[in-house]
């Protein structure tokens, strides 16, 4: 896409793409579970993005959640459209050409390819992706090269990932609950999402967890442990019930010790009963504000 845009802006430019892998768009071909989630109607400037893809011949459809996919729901079609556009514009692609390093001279850039080739260019555009999913070729090469050329690089952390927790909740592994989840930093609300949370052996996962994970930012120079401890994740298992304590009080008259039955999954029910004892107010608080402490983001490969 970067090469196509550059060529469209300057039709006389001679452009070559150095592709690390032997095939084009391997990571793009795997996005959206192979369907290629191009954009979302909730994203800013999504219409501009769609116009770009329309210009490449990609017709899209939007699902009920606002996610935008190619009508074929095949990410490889998007890859093919990009390759065809490069062919049409006369953009050369050199495959299996991982860049080892780049040197900046007065007149140009000297780009060294691992297998021994060297290319000189007056301009260099680094569009090497991030660091997530190394099996698709993205291992942080772009930031490494940019840093070698004098650019400042902020700390790289995974985003849109599951969250590891300080609390030991392995006994809840496999439990899924639709709920409202919120991220807090030193008592300040940062982000709120609604969706399904999945408890795992290490912490929590699910799309709503991925969405809040990108807001967990540890500043440069701050140790990760102390940085994570400033955040809290709160889960409201019953966001549709405002007066939960009153509801539980009424249920306790009819159901006695079984007043939590049918509200959440059994494993979670047993845990809340164990921690709250017969204190209905405490049980209500746990259901409305189940508070957790992140200790890490899951990582680049998850």
Model regions and ranges:
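Glycine-rich loop(s) and the adjacent beta-strand/alpha-helix scaffold that form part
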Residues: 123-169
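Glycine-rich FAD pyrophosphate-binding loop
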Residues: 7-32
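N-terminal glycine-rich dinucleotide-binding loop that anchors FAD/FMN and/or NAD(P) in oxidoreductases
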Residues: 26-51
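Short beta-strand to alpha-helix junction loop
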Residues: 44-47, 65-84, 133-137, 165-168, ...
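Short loop/edge segments at beta-strand edges and connector loops
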Residues: 93-97, 113, 155-157, 298
């Amino acid at each position: 896409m970067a090469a196509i845009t550059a060529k469209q802006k300057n039709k006389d430019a001679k452009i070559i793409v150095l592709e690390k892998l032997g095939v084009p768009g391997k990571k793009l071909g795997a996005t959206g579970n192979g369907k290629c989630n191009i954009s979302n109607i909730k994203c800013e400037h999504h219409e501009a993005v769609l116009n770009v893809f329309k210009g490449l011949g990609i017709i899209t459809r939007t699902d009920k959640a606002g996610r935008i996919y190619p009508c074929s729901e095949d990410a490889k079609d998007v890859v093919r459209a990009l390759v065809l556009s490069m062919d049409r514009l006369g953009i050369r692609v050199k495959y299996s050409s991982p860049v080892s390093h780049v040197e900046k001279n007065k007149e140009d850039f000297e780009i060294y390819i691992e297998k021994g080739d060297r290319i000189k260019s007056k301009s260099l555009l680094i569009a090497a992706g991030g660091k997530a999913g190394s099996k698709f070729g993205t291992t942080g090469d772009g930031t490494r090269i940019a840093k070698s050329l004098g650019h400042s690089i902020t700390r790289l952390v995974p985003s849109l990932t599951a969250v590891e927790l300080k609390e030991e909740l392995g006994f809840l592994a496999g439990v899924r609950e639709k709920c409202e989840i919120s991220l807090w930093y030193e008592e300040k609300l940062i982000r709120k999402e609604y969706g399904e949370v999945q408890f795992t052996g290490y912490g929590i996962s699910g799309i709503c967890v991925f969405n809040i994970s990108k807001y967990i930012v540890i500043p440069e120079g701050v140790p990760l442990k102390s940085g994570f401890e400033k955040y809290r994740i709160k889960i409201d298992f019953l966001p549709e019930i405002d007066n939960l304590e009153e509801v539980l009080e009424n249920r306790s008259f009819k159901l006695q010790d079984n007043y939590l039955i049918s509200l959440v999954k059994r494993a979670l029910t047993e845990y809340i009963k164990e921690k709250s004892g017969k204190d209905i107010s405490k049980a209500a608080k746990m259901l409305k504000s189940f508070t957790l402490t992140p200790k890490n983001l899951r990582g680049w490969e998850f």
